Amino acid sequence: MATPDEDEDEDGIPGLPPNTPFYMTPEGHRAMRDELHALWSVERPKVVEVVSWAAGLGDRSENADYQYGKKRLREIDRRVRFLRKRLDRAEVVDPATQTRRDQVFFGATVTFVHEDDREVTVTIVGAEEADAGQGRISWLSPVARALLGKRVGDVVRLRKPGGAEEVEVLRIAYP
């Protein structure tokens, strides 16, 4: 049974079957490992030190340093569990090794044009790496799923809340 301190859905990606692959680029995997290392080896020891110091002051019920420190430790431990589980399940896919560069696959940078001649460039990455503001979309997103397997010149139908729209694939690039 999960305690209130645990994420109930730490293992899976919400809304997907439990055995869905957890693809990541090498850069995303490295960033996740770096975050885990920083939390476990740098931040957590500092917080433990503050909590130990605060616990030595006596009454813990009104000790803000102690209470905040314990809360922060729970947050760190939750994130560490999450990162470890993700890293254990990660399937690192290096887009630079893609041999079929004429089609859209994981890791591709795709430029497409909307019906109003507006060009958009996106890179298809892992779910944890997605950042729409940076043009990095999850391979699980509706746009990426519509683009996967397409070639330059293909017309793709994107379903949007305001209705469907057709876009044409202009360029496909891999690192």
Model-identified regions with their sequence ranges:
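Structured, basic alpha/beta domains of bacterial-type, RNA-associated proteins
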Residues: D77-Q98
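Low-complexity, charged, repeat-rich alpha-helical/coil interaction segments
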Residues: P21-D34, R72, R79, K85, ...
